[in-house]
Amino acid sequence: MRSSAASDVYKRQVDEAAHTVAVKGPKGSLNSNYHPLMTVKVEGNEILVTRPNDEKEARSLHGLTRTNIHNMVVGVTEGFRKDLEIQGVGYRCAKQGSKLVLTLGFSHPVEVAETETIKIEVKDALHFSILGSDKQEVGQFAAEVRSKRPPEPYKGKGIRYVGEFVIRKEGKAGKGK
């Protein structure tokens, strides 16, 4: 893998004996293990991932390792973001301290707390974003928030990702006249 990010933006460290990669940048630091079949080296400004042969498993692991390291570099330099929106009459969100408070038609408000690595940004009453440096963690947190009230297929009410298309169903057919 050839990483094109500048060396002065982030610091990287590879421990070949423990099969770990550590990346530090302005948005934090991330560590990751990689498969023992792969070889990861730092050469100048680049992180180089090589595979021992062209077997299917080695090719798959090569792409996985390269992508994971790339996501780590992007995460510590730029960060990741998932934008979500709320649709439905009376549904809304607000931020109280470090908690996201969701009013979703339940008898009680649903509260979701920020973590050390995940931040929540509320744009308005119907739009909010999940921010962080770890792509997997941001996606998992966004999925957990979305699961509090996923979009239903009849009216489309619920929490959805911005740009997500929800397949709508037709309601009950009326009695024939």
Each predicted region: which residue ranges?
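Single conserved hydrophobic/aromatic residue that forms the stacking wall/gate
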Residues: 1-10
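A positional/architectural concept
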Residues: 7, 16-41
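A structural signal for short hydrophobic beta-strand segments in well-ordered beta-sheet cores
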Residues: 12-14, 38-42, 91-93, 119-120
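Short, charge-patterned binding micro-sites
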Residues: 36, 42-59
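Extended, positively charged loop/linker patches that create polyanion-binding surfaces
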Residues: 52-135
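Mixed-charge, glycine-accented linear interaction segment located at domain edges/termini
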Residues: 124-157
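Short, low-order "capping/linker" segments at domain edges
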Residues: 163-177
